[in-house]
């Protein structure tokens, strides 16, 4: 049976590594959705490369039975661009968080989108620096109290959609970790898109920012949500 005739299953994309995210972390759901999306698209594991920077979400390449590269802080987009340029036949994915992507990596992010190279960028947004134990991030809301903003941050947050569209991106989607069906469908559409795609996934950090997306998932909770 040829690769083209092979029907891949989600389990074919799972590595044998122990998943080292906190119990209840939204990253688990996104990983499972990515496995399902890749099976739906039918990309062979050996034709896929998953690149990441630094942060909780950036451990994801370890959990994929594909080529992977856990790189340095903020530089994932630049390295993913290099991988795609050298191996245009590969399905290249960048896994990044709000701090990794929009602070130290902001320059690389907007230029990757501007160049419109065929990259799949998945931005995990929990509005906090989780790996370094709870500092505010570029997407934290004004007034957010954290270890690095004990009196509340005085800064307005970046809105990933505005950055992506401002860089002339032509594929932006936003989904949330608890909606597995929609997240899988969005990642599938991202994989099939030709050019740079940006998928923002709102994820919950149960340790340092639990319930940050309550206004979206809780129908009893009223909140102003800006996109």
Report residues per predicted region.
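Active-site diphosphate/adenylate-binding microenvironment
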Residues: 7, 11-72
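Short coil/turn connectors at secondary-structure junctions
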Residues: 17, 44-48, 86-92, 114-120, ...
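Short catalytic-loop micro-motif centered on adjacent basic/acidic residues
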Residues: 21-23, 94-96, 171-176, 198
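Glycine-rich beta-alpha junction loops
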Residues: 54-56, 126-128, 179, 202-207
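Thiamine diphosphate
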Residues: 56-130, 182
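Conserved thiamine diphosphate
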Residues: 89, 137-192
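Active-site-proximal loop->helix
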Residues: 106-113, 131-144, 163
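Conserved small/polar residues in nucleotide/adenosyl-binding loops
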Residues: 225-227
């Amino acid at each position: 049976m040829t690769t083209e005739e092979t029907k891949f299953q989600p389990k074919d994309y799972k590595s044998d590594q122990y998943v080292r995210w906190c119990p209840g972390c939204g990253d688990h759901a996104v990983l499972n959705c990515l496995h399902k999306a890749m099976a739906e698209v039918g990309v062979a594991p050996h034709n896929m490369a998953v690149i990441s920077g630094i942060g909780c979400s950036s451990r994801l390449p370890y959990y994929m039975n594909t080529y992977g590269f856990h790189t340095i802080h903020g530089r994932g987009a630049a390295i993913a661009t290099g991988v795609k340029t050298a191996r245009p036949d590969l399905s290249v994915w960048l896994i990044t968080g709000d701090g990794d992507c929009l602070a130290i990596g902001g320059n690389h992010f907007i230029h990757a989108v501007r160049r419109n190279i065929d990259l799949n960028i998945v931005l995990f947004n929990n509005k906090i620096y989780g790996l370094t134990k709870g500092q505010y991030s570029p997407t934290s809301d004004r007034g957010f109290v954290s270890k690095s903003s004990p009196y509340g941050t005085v800064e307005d947050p970046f809105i990933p959609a505005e950055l992506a569209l401002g860089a002339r991106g032509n594929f932006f989607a936003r989904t949330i970790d608890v909606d597995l069906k929609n997240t899988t469908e969005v990642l599938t559409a991202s994989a099939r898109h030709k050019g740079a795609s940006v998928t923002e996934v709102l994820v919950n950090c149960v340790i340092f920012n639990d319930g940050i997306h309550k206004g979206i998932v809780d129908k009893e909770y009223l909140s102003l949500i800006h996109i």
